Amino acid sequence: MSNPQQLRYSKEHEWLSALEDGVATIGITEYAANALGDVVYAQLPEVGDTVTAGETCGELESTKSVSDLYSPVTGEVTAANQDVVDDPSLVNSAPFEGGWLFKVRVAEEPADLLSADEYTAFSGN
């Protein structure tokens, strides 16, 4: 399993893209997707919602369990991936591409995000 070098990672197994005009794309890692099993339902934050770093903002339901979704940053949601709502299996099949979850206009990027190498060491994958 490979964690893309250009992304940053949280200890809750979310990834965050580099800021583009102050907006970051967020998803869960391949490690988290594999641990969840087949995702069958996604409840994502809605456009206009304010999310807070480290707090729950949605959930993913798999054939194994229901898991809270945490935001790695604080800010306003600018997009939610309707494709994932319609086809939650995208989280498993393409966690770093089509399986992204939501986008946030970042108010403040936390300092505790990990590099790809740090996340790999943390997760063991």
From Swiss-Prot:
NCBIfam families: gcvH, PRK01202.1
Names of the cofactor(s): (R)-lipoate
Quaternary context: The glycine cleavage system is composed of four proteins: P, T, L and H.
Keyword Kinase: no
Protein name in the entry: Glycine cleavage system H protein
Alphabetical keyword list: Lipoyl
One of the record's GO cellular component terms: glycine cleavage complex
GO biological process, alphabetically ordered: glycine decarboxylation via glycine cleavage system
Annotated HAMAP family: GcvH (MF_00272)
Matches recorded under PANTHER family: GLYCINE CLEAVAGE SYSTEM H PROTEIN (PTHR11715), GLYCINE CLEAVAGE SYSTEM H PROTEIN-RELATED (PTHR11715:SF3)
Pfam families to which the protein is assigned, alphabetical: GCV_H
Family per similarity comment: Belongs to the GcvH family.
Annotated ranges, domain Lipoyl-binding: 23-105
Designated gene of the protein: gcvH
Organism: Streptomyces griseus subsp. griseus (strain JCM 4626 / CBS 651.72 / NBRC 13350 / KCC S-0626 / ISP 5235)
Cofactor note: Binds 1 lipoyl cofactor covalently.
Residue(s) carrying N6-lipoyllysine: K64
Domain of life where this protein originates: Bacteria
